[in-house]
Regions:
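Short loop/turn segments immediately following beta-strands, especially the blade-tip
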Residues: 68-73, 135-144
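Short, conserved, GDST-rich strand-edge loop motifs in beta-rich repeat architectures
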Residues: 56-62, 123-124, 173-183
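Surface loop/turn motifs at the tips and blade-to-blade linkers of beta-strand repeat domains
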Residues: 35-38, 79-81, 99-101, 151-156
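Beta-rich catalytic cores
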Residues: 41, 61, 105, 128, ...
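Residue-level detector of Asp-centered blade-edge/turn motifs that repeat once per structural unit
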Residues: 48-51, 112-117, 165-168
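Beta-strand-rich domains and repeat architectures in extracellular enzymes and scaffolds
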Residues: 34-64
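A short helix->beta-strand "capping" segment at the edge of beta-propeller domains
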Residues: 24-41, 146
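Blade-loop segments of beta-propeller domains
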Residues: 70-113
């Protein structure tokens, strides 16, 4: 079921990046293909386990994380929002200078489930800074919400691409390109 949902979601969001059709422009189904309206430049997806929710990163100039409801294919901005309340974990992310809401520009994302069952989202961020931003996901409301808890700044001349959480709290990230655009 999860694999089917992931494949459907990947296919659906990839359709948004191809040449638009009349059905896609109106966000109506085109035969068996369903479209998701709203996310701009979707780059990566993460399924929120045991829920109808997907998180999509939108790598545009300002950039957002989007929450997609797989039941009706609707979407909404998840982060950054003016109402966001950060909770900086300075023990785990002491080298992080704090939240920066401007020019978010998210790229690769990875969602993990902790030993306590809580979800954590790791987000490669370009824009105002090159970093991996870390969020706790709150599933207690009608829709999930994010709380920013910290970041890991990229070393000089490193441009992250994808990120994955490792056992015992570590993370690994790929280096996409040099700041001048060379690979």
């Amino acid at each position: 079921m999860r694999l089917r949902l992931l494949l459907l979601s990947c296919f659906t969001l990839s359709c948004l990046m191809t040449a638009p059709s009349t059905a896609a422009a109106a966000c109506e189904a085109d035969g068996a293909v369903q479209f998701v309206c709203g996310p701009v430049s979707p780059e990566d997806l993460a399924i929120v386990p045991e829920s109808p929710w997907l998180i999509a990163s939108g790598m545009e100039d300002d950039g957002y994380l989007y929450l997609v409801d797989t039941r009706d294919y609707s979407s909404a901005v998840l982060y950054p929002l003016p109402s966001a309340q950060p909770r900086h974990d300075t023990v785990s992310y002491g080298d992080c200078p704090g939240p920066n809401m401007s020019a978010f520009r998210p790229h690769g994302i990875n969602l993990t489930t902790g030993a306590d069952g809580a979800y954590r989202l790791y987000v490669v961020r370009h824009g105002a800074r090159e970093s991996i931003e870390v969020f706790d996901i709150d599933m207690t409301g009608a829709t999930p919400s994010l709380t920013w808890i910290g970041c890991v700044l990229a070393p000089e001349a490193v441009v992250f691409n994808s990120v994955v959480a490792l056992p015992e709290g570590g993370i690994a990230a790929t280096h996409f390109q040099m700041p001048d655009g060379s690979v």
